[in-house]
Amino acid sequence: MDHHLQGTPAARREGRPTVSLIISTYNRPRALDRVLASVARQQEMPLQVLVADDGSGSETVQVVARWRERLGERLLHCWQPDEGFRLSAARNRAIREATGELIVFVDGDCLLRPDFVEAHQQVAERGFATAGNRVLLGQAVTADIEAGRQNPLDWSCLRWLMAWRRGDVNHALGLLRLPGQGWRRMSGRPWRHFKGCNMALWRDDIIRMNGFEEKIAGWGFEDTDLVLRWFNLGGRLKNGRFATTVLHLWHREAARDAAEENERRARLAGSRGATVAEQGLAQLADDDRPAPPGGI
């Protein structure tokens, strides 16, 4: 484990929203360990770090417990029993505990650059959700990262270009940052830009929409359902590219048996003007907060 904790206190800076960072995970403890290490290096620490756990076992519980020694009480483990792929429900459990003004969502296999939280704070604007982006890392370099043999967050620009030439990363300009805000405001309903591995919405907007639709189970399109309801509410997107980029560790593709039905359901909700999830935050029982096995 990295034994340093960087960043400024989580108190609200003038003009910047407080952030609750929600990290979704399921039985990938080594990846989660590296993600939490990247959280500890943030220049602007989030108010909260909430692990939205879809039923992981004891190894993940141990990872969270170890990092809580470094991150303190800001780190919360929001766990639910393993009853199949229920990402929407896992995220809703974390949203329920969130107190930050802005909620940033990432996957538990996405490394955060040191200015990630700060960049989301800077891009955030009322009336907009932020669509972040990702750089994909290859299988071999991912194995090295999870084993602690290298860390792409420490690479120089030259080393990054060499990694791209070798096929270890899929974007040569993955480290590039571009200033400005106006060009980030997207028009229309560009829902394909909104990816669950890196996105941000205002907490009060998510609550207005009743969170994620838990009727969408199995892999895929829970983020599409959310953003289409956001558009129906009158919301727009901002492009977080070249500011809020995450580094996405390699993994095998999940089973996509439910993808077709999930896409149909999400598109139907969008086309009929839905803004509120039928089964979401409001349907969570207040006392339904299961503890992880042997965890905190």
Task: Describe the residue ranges of each PLM region.
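N-proximal low-complexity "stem/linker" segments adjacent to membrane-targeting elements
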Residues: 1-41
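Cell-envelope/extracellular polymer assembly enzymes that use nucleotide-activated donors
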Residues: 17-20, 48, 225
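Acidic donor-binding segment of Leloir-type glycosyltransferases
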Residues: 36-84
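Glycine-rich, basic loop-to-helix element that forms the pyrophosphate-binding segment
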Residues: 81-98, 115
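Short aromatic/hydrophobic "clamp" motif used to bind/position activated sugar donors
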Residues: 103
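The conserved acidic donor/metal-binding loop of glycosyltransferases
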Residues: 107-111
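Conserved donor NDP-sugar-binding/catalytic core segment of glycosyltransferases
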Residues: 115-164
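A short, conserved alpha-helix in the catalytic core of glycosyltransferases
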Residues: 193-210, 217-235, 241-242
